[in-house]
Amino acid sequence: MAKKSKIVKDQKQRELVLKYAKLRLELKKKADYAGLSQIPAKASPVRLKNRDSIDGRPRGYIRKFGISRINFRQLAHQGKLPGVRKTSW
């Protein structure tokens, strides 16, 4: 489990990215790089770190499900992830 402060910081940063997304797109189309530099650097979607949506864990992130490998395993064993089956080869 990540610290509460890290989870809150990540949520605030995602809100900031959404807030400036439209403006960033317009400025990029116009090639107004001076205007882009006036926008906060944290508003860039490149700076986002993928975190587990359940507990905020930053590592072992599975993009398709938006959770970490640990939570993926727990939910898969409980049968709470549709379309996921245990396999062996």
Swiss-Prot record:
Could you tell me which InterPro entries the record lists for this protein? Ribosomal_uS14, Ribosomal_uS14_bac/plastid, Ribosomal_uS14_sf
Keyword Ribosomal protein in annotation: yes
Q: Name one GO cellular component term.
A: small ribosomal subunit
Indicate yes or no for the key word Ribosomal protein. yes
User: What Gene3D superfamilies is this protein classified in?
Assistant: 30s Ribosomal Protein S14, Chain N
User: A biological process (GO) annotation for this entry?
Assistant: translation
A GO molecular function term, named singly, is: structural constituent of ribosome
The UniProt keywords, alphabetically, are:
Ribonucleoprotein, Ribosomal protein, RNA-binding, rRNA-binding
Protein family per UniProt: Belongs to the universal ribosomal protein uS14 family.
Q: What does this protein do?
A: Binds 16S rRNA, required for the assembly of 30S particles and may also be responsible for determining the conformation of the 16S rRNA at the A site.
**Family matches, as HAMAP family:** Ribosomal_uS14_1
Q: How does this protein assemble? A: Part of the 30S ribosomal subunit. Contacts proteins S3 and S10.
Identify this protein by name. Answer: Small ribosomal subunit protein uS14
